[in-house]
Each structure stands twice: as structure tokens, then as C-alpha cells.
């Protein structure tokens, strides 16, 4: 890996982690299309740390409120809408955590390919477009129920398939349930905090138990660049969807998917 590759991949991770266009697809493509070597376990941990820090920093007020309410619901048995939402975020994390433990190796071996990415990019892009155009979008995140949270959790688990997009499929599921675009995005981003924490911790444990060589310059680049780009991305995404909806991201997914299919057919 070079510093240019580290910068480019971290920028890619930061800009795509929270957009409905699949960060995993964009990180796989450089190795598939450009022939770049795998970025390595340590770099994966670094960009997870950067994007996690970005979403926590952006939603710091909400995170503090939810954590406080959740703590009081346990210690003092005080329950309110914030503690309920915190518990529902935890519930929504369970399906992805379980599926990650059960199917991660299978997905890495059989589904991590450019063909799968091309197809899922197109299919789930069209699904996002259809749901965005045909659903009644009136609910906010505090109208979440345990059944809806579990449904979103199952959607998040399906995002393990490369090209699906974690934010894309969870936002699609939330729109289908009638949540506004802004509420769907906010809940999707809040859902990402525990799952990115779990994924980063798992990768960190693997790194600690491995003999991998750690290049702290690349790690620092990964953390800083992914943090800045993810923070900017979250800010502008939340402003953009209120006026333009999901159409720009659907168009991008269709262009990416069809271009990738064409490239695969010609090589």
C-alpha cells in the first residue's frame, strides 16, 4: 500500500459508509478493477475507527441523551421515549451481529465478487427508488416499535451481501415502514454506531491476535481522512435528501452497476 492508496481508500470509505451506495462495494472495486493489493486488517480497523468517530461526533447530543436515558432505564427504572429508542437501536443490532458470526466466512468466500456487487447495486438501487416514490413518509424515529426495529435489523443483516449498502437497505426498509427520509436516515446512522463498534472490535481482536505488520502512518491517514470525509458526508446527505430525495443515489447506483457489468463482460 502507498500513501495515495491509503488516502484514496479512506476517502472512499468515509464518503460511502453513510450514503446508500455501498462502502464495501467501493472498497472491493479497487482491487478487482485496478489490481490494488488488499489494504490489510490494520487499515480496516483504522477506517472503522474514523467513520465511527464521525457519526458519534455528528450525533453527539443524541448519543449522550440516548445513553443517559438508557442508563436511567436500567438503574432507576425510569422510562421515556429516549430510553425506548435506545433499546430499539440495541434490538436492531442483534440480527446483523448474529448473521455476522454465522455467515461472514461464507459471504467472504462466495459472494465477495464484482459480479455480485454489480447485480446488488442495481437491484437494491431500484428497490430504493420504488420505495422512496411509493411510500407515505410521515413518521419520525420516536414512532419506532420493536417489530419495526427488528425489521430494520434484518435489513441491516442483509447488508452483509456486498453491494447492498447498509445505509441503503436500512433507509429503504424505514421508508417502506412510512418514516420520513430524515428520520429514516437518522435512525440508520444511529443503528450504525453499535454495529460499527462490534465490527471494529472484532477486527481489532483479530489484529491483536495476528502477526500483521502495523504501519502507523497508513493507520493515521485512514483514521483522519475517513473521519473528515464521513462527517462531511453525513452533514450534506441529511440536507440533500429533504429536497432531492433518493433519486441522485439511485441514478449513481444504476450507472455504477451497469458500468461494472459492461466492464466484466468485456474482460
UniProtKB/Swiss-Prot annotation:
Keyword annotations: Antibiotic resistance, Cell inner membrane, Cell membrane, Cell shape, Cell wall biogenesis/degradation, Hydrolase, Membrane, Peptidoglycan synthesis, Transmembrane, Transmembrane helix
Gene Ontology molecular function: undecaprenyl-diphosphatase activity
InterPro entries linked: UppP (IPR003824)
GO terms under cellular component: plasma membrane
Taxonomic superkingdom: Bacteria
Pfam families linked to this entry: BacA (PF02673)
Catalytic reaction annotation: di-trans,octa-cis-undecaprenyl diphosphate + H2O = di-trans,octa-cis-undecaprenyl phosphate + phosphate + H(+)
Subcellular location: Cell inner membrane
Residue stretches spanning the membrane: 1-21, 39-59, 87-107, 111-131, 149-169, 189-209, 218-238, 246-266
Any one of the GO BP annotations: response to antibiotic
EC number: 3.6.1.27
Protein's membrane topology: Multi-pass membrane protein
Keyword Lipid metabolism assigned: no
Keyword Membrane carried by entry: yes
Function: Catalyzes the dephosphorylation of undecaprenyl diphosphate (UPP). Confers resistance to bacitracin.
Note: Bacitracin is thought to be involved in the inhibition of peptidoglycan synthesis by sequestering undecaprenyl diphosphate, thereby reducing the pool of lipid carrier available.
PANTHER family reported for this sequence: UNDECAPRENYL-DIPHOSPHATASE
Record-given protein name: Undecaprenyl-diphosphatase
Amino acid at each position: 500500500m502507498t500513501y495515495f492508496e491509503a488516502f484514496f481508500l479512506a476517502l472512499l470509505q468515509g464518503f460511502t459508509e453513510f450514503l446508500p451506495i455501498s462502502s464495501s462495494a467501493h472498497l472491493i472495486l479497487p482491487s478487482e478493477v485496478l489490481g490494488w493489493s488488499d489494504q490489510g486488517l490494520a487499515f480496516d480497523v483504522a477506517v472503522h475507527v474514523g467513520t465511527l468517530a464521525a457519526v458519534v461526533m455528528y450525533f453527539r447530543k443524541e448519543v449522550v441523551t440516548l445513553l443517559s436515558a438508557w442508563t436511567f432505564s436500567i438503574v432507576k427504572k425510569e422510562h421515556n421515549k429516549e430510553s425506548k429508542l435506545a433499546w430499539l437501536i440495541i434490538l436492531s443490532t442483534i440480527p446483523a451481529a448474529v448473521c455476522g458470526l454465522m455467515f461472514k466466512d461464507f459471504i467472504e468466500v462466495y459472494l465477495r465478487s464484482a459480479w455480485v456487487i454489480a447485480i446488488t447495486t442495481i437491484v437494491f438501487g431500484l428497490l430504493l427508488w420504488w420505495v422512496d416514490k411509493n411510500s407515505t413518509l410521515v413518521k419520525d424515529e420516536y414512532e419506532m416499535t420493536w417489530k419495526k426495529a427488528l425489521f430494520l435489523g434484518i435489513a441491516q443483516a442483509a447488508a452483509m451481501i456486498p453491494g447492498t449498502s447498509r445505509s441503503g437497505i436500512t433507509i429503504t426498509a424505514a421508508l417502506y415502514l412510512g418514516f420520513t427520509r430524515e428520520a429514516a436516515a437518522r435512525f440508520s446512522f444511529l443503528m450504525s454506531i453499535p454495529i460499527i463498534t462490534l465490527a471494529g472490535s472484532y477486527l481489532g481482536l483479530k489484529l491483536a491476535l495476528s502477526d500483521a505488520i502495523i504501519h502507523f502512518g497508513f493507520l493515521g491517514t485512514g483514521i483522519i481522512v475517513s473521519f473528515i470525509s464521513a462527517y462531511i458526508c453525513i452533514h450534506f446527505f441529511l440536507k440533500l435528501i429533504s429536497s432531492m430525495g433518493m433519486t441522485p443515489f439511485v441514478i449513481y447506483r444504476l450507472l455504477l452497476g451497469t458500468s461494472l457489468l459492461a466492464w466484466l463482460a468485456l474482460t
